[in-house]
C-alpha cells in the first residue's frame, strides 16, 4: 500500500463515498473481485488538510490503484484522510454505523490501539504476506502468538532536511550544528518529545528516559541525564539562529519560505518540501552528539483490516494489502516516491543510484541502532501530550530545568503504569 501520507479538522473524503458494494463490469473470471473498498489513511496532526495534501495522497495512491485495478477492474477504491488526533474517535463513530474503513493505513501505535479497541481484525502469522517481510518489522506488530495487529507496509524515518542553497552539507554532529549557527546558518527544531527523541541518544539521555518509561527505579544518574538533556535544549533555544517551536507545521512552513535553512523532518514531508525547494532540498541523517549517536524514531506504517466489511469487501481489502507488499510494488513505490522505505526483505534499496534513498537508509539505520527507542513508541502509554505540555512550559520559561526534569520523570513514570 503506497499511501505513506502524513503519520486537521475532521476527515477529507478524497473520492466521494458511494455504495459499499458495487455492480462491477461483466466478467466470467471466477477470481475477479467486486467491491468498493474504503481505505482510511492516518495523517499527522500537524499536516494541514489542503489541496497540497490531496495532491500528495492522490500521487502516492495513483500508482497502487492503477496497478491493482489492472488486475481487479471491478474493485473501486475510495480514500479517507483521517487526522492522527481524531483517528480513534472517527473510526469508532463510523463503526457504530457500520461504515468504518475496510482497510486502514496508519502508524503502528495507532494500529495497535485500534486493535485493542476491537475495531480491526488481526492478520495470521505465518502467512504468505508476512513471510516475505523483514522479521524486525513483524516483531513490531506482533500482538499474540500466531497473529499481528496489522500488515507492515513501509518505514518513514526521521532525518534532516536542509536547503542546499544555504548549506553545502548537513552538520554531522551537534557541535557542527552549533558552529554553523554561529556562522549565520539558521536551524529549526520542534518542541515535541518524539520529534526530539533523536537528541536523547546524542546527549546521553535515551537509556534514562526509556528506563523511567519502562518502570525502573529513578536514580540520581537518571535525573542528571534527563536534566542535562533539558539544559542542552535551553542552551540551543538561547542561540540567535536556532528556532525551537511547538508547531511542526510552522517549522515546515518557515523552511519552505526560506526563513530557516535546516530542520528535522520526516520522510512523509519530502513530497511537500520538494514542491517548494526543488533540487535545493537536501536530505541527511541527523547529527550525532558528544554522548552517542542520534536516535531518531522511524515510523512503521501498517495496513489494518476493518471489522465492518462485507465478505466481498474483506476479500478485496486483503488482496489490496497483499498486493501493496509484494516485491514488485514495494520496489516501484520506493523508487517512485523516494520518501519511504520498503518492508519486503526481497527489495534492496538502490542507495548507490539515489542520493535521497541513501539518506533515508542511513536515517533508518540510526533508528535501528537504538533499541531503547522501542519503549518510547509503545501504545500502552499515551504520555506524549502530557510530556509535550511540560516541554512547552519549559520552552517558554514557566518551568526551570529541575522542575521540568521532575515533571517529565513523573509523566514518564505514569506512562509506565499498566
Where are these regions (language model features)?
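Conserved N-terminal structural module of periplasmic/extracytoplasmic solute-binding proteins
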Residues: 1-110, 414-418
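Hinge/lid segment of periplasmic solute-binding proteins
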Residues: 106-159, 169, 284
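A ligand-binding cleft/hinge motif common to bilobed small-molecule-binding domains
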Residues: 110-115, 256, 264-280
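Short, solvent-exposed loop/beta-turn-alpha elements that line the ligand-binding surface or hinge
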Residues: 125-133, 185-187, 207-228, 275, ...
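Extracytoplasmic/periplasmic solute-binding protein
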Residues: 149-153, 158, 175-219, 225, ...
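Glycine-centered hinge/linker elements that transmit conformational signals in sensory
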Residues: 215-248
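Extracytoplasmic/periplasmic substrate-recognition and gating elements
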Residues: 274-340
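Long, aromatic- and glycine/proline-rich binding clefts that accommodate carbohydrate-like moieties
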Residues: 335-389, 393
Amino acid at each position: 500500500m503506497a499511501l505513506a501520507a502524513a503519520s486537521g479538522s475532521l476527515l477529507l473524503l478524497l473520492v466521494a463515498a458511494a455504495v459499499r458494494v458495487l455492480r462491477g463490469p461483466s466478467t466470467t473470471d471466477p477470481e475477479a473481485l467486486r467491491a468498493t473498498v474504503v481505505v482510511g489513511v492516518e495523517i499527522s496532526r500537524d499536516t494541514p488538510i489542503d489541496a497540497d495534501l490531496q495532491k500528495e495522497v492522490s500521487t502516492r495512491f495513483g500508482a497502487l490503484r492503477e496497478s491493482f485495478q489492472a488486475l481487479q477492474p471491478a474493485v473501486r477504491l475510495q480514500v479517507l484522510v483521517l487526522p492522527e488526533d481524531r483517528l480513534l474517535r472517527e473510526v469508532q463513530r463510523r463503526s457504530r454505523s457500520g461504515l468504518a474503513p475496510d482497510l486502514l493505513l496508519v502508524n503502528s501505535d495507532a494500529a495497535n490501539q485500534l486493535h485493542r479497541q476491537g475495531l480491526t481484525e488481526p492478520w495470521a502469522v505465518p502467512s504468505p504476506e508476512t513471510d516475505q517481510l523483514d522479521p524486525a518489522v513483524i516483531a513490531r506488530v506482533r500482538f499474540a502468538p500466531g497473529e499481528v495487529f496489522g500488515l507492515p507496509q513501509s518505514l518513514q524515518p526521521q532525518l534532516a532536511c536542509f536547503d542546499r542553497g544555504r548549506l553545502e552539507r548537513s552538520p554531522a554532529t551537534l557541535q557542527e550544528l552549533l558552529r554553523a549557527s554561529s556562522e549565520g546558518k539558521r536551524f529549526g527544531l520542534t518542541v515535541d518529545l518524539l520529534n526530539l527523541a533523536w537528541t536523547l541518544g546524542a546527549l546521553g539521555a535515551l537509556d534514562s528516559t526509556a528506563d523511567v518509561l519502562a518502570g525502573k527505579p529513578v536514580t540520581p544518574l537518571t535525573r542528571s541525564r534527563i536534566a542535562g538533556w533539558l539544559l542542552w535544549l535551553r542552551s540551543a533555544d538561547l542561540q540567535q539562529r536556532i528556532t525551537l517551536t511547538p508547531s511542526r507545521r510552522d517549522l515546515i512552513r518557515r523552511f519552505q519560505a526560506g526563513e530557516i535553512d535546516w530542520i528535522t523532518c520526516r520522510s512523509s514531508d519530502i513530497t511537500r518540501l520538494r514542491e517548494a525547494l526543488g533540487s535545493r532540498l537536501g536530505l541527511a541523517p541527523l547529527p550525532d552528539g558528544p554522548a552517542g549517536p542520534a536516535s531518531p524514531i522511524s515510523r512503521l506504517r501498517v495496513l489494518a483490516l476493518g471489522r465492518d466489511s462485507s465478505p466481498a469487501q474483506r476479500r478485496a481489502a486483503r488482496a489490496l494489502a497483499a498486493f501493496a507488499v509484494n516485491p514488485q510494488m514495494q520496489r516501484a513505490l520506493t523508487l517512485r516516491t523516494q520518501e519511504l522505505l520498503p518492508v519486503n526483505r526481497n527489495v534492496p534499496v538502490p542507495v548507490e543510484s539515489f542520493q535521497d534513498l541513501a539518506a533515508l537508509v542511513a536515517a533508518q539505520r540510526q533508528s535501528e541502532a537504538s533499541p531503547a527507542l522501542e519503549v518510547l513508541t509503545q501504545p500502552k502509554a499515551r504520555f506524549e501530550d502530557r510530556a509535550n505540555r511540560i516541554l512547552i512550559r519549559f520552552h517558554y520559561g514557566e518551568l526551570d530545568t529541575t522542575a521540568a526534569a521532575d515533571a517529565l520523570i513523573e509523566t514518564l513514570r505514569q506512562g509506565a503504569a499498566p
